[in-house]
Amino acid sequence: MRQPDSSLPRTGQDHTLSPYEPELGEVPSNDLSMADLDNVNKTGTTTIGISTAEGVVIATDMRASLGGRFVSNKNVQKVEQIHPSAALTLVGSVGGAQSFIRSLRAEVDLYEARRGEDISINALATLAGNFARGGPFFAINPILGGVDDEGHHVYSIDPAGGVMKDDYTVTGSGLTVAYGTLEREYEDDMTNEEAKRVAASGIKAAVERDTGSGNGVFLATVTDEDVEIKGHKDFDEVL
């Protein structure tokens, strides 16, 4: 039997070759215990992604908690621009989610530099899924929304690396409450402004019942030209 080449990159977790390693090098590892994770800042969270006739709208709450018992921050921006026409939410531990986004941005830049073309949103979602499965990012469950030549896309990415596309999706601790609002208010071919109101309504409903969500809403509007992100402490500003 042929032995693995010891000169090839290996993961820091089990020292076996991984098909999910990024092109830039190894996915970073961690040695945190379950007790350590209880003291990690977590987003808790409710995040929503909606595909519209004009692009994509993403909404998140603003709360971070420590060990699920203490509100450690009331102004966390849980959605970040990941590409000129795509945005990604932060769900899970704050540090893990931020590391995930930094790593993914670097990989996208490398992908486009090597190929001389923009990455498609489908390829970006696949890359994000590979990272979620192969990296120590503490069970993140983000939403990716983007626009490319093929249309407007919303993907949910599960901790095992699964990538699922839908017209709208919800992740986070408040998803059961928010889904009820979206099932009632979502319509095909909404404008971005209409979708922002529906998404904000879903976040508000989750904030009322989910202790991991709260303190306002961030709304991201994604078009083929740019990503605009704005925070609102008062839901009445957008409803």
Swiss-Prot record:
Return any one Pfam family short name: Proteasome
Q: What class of enzyme is it?
A: hydrolase
Q: What EC number(s) are associated with this protein in UniProt? A: 3.4.25.1
Q: What residues sit in the active site?
A: T45 (nucleophile)
Please tell me where this protein is predominantly located: cytoplasm
Q: Which residues form the signal peptide?
A: none
Reaction catalysed by this enzyme:
Cleavage of peptide bonds with very broad specificity
Q: Which GO terms describe its biological process?
A: proteasomal protein catabolic process
Superkingdom field? Archaea
Instruction: Characterize the regulation of its activity.
Output: The formation of the proteasomal ATPase PAN-20S proteasome complex, via the docking of the C-termini of PAN into the intersubunit pockets in the alpha-rings, triggers opening of the gate for substrate entry. Interconversion between the open-gate and close-gate conformations leads to a dynamic regulation of the 20S proteasome proteolysis activity.
Q: Which residues form the propeptide?
A: 1-44
PROSITE patterns hit by this protein: PROTEASOME_BETA_2 (PS51476)
Briefly, what is this protein's role?
Component of the proteasome core, a large protease complex with broad specificity involved in protein degradation.
Which protein is depicted? Proteasome subunit beta
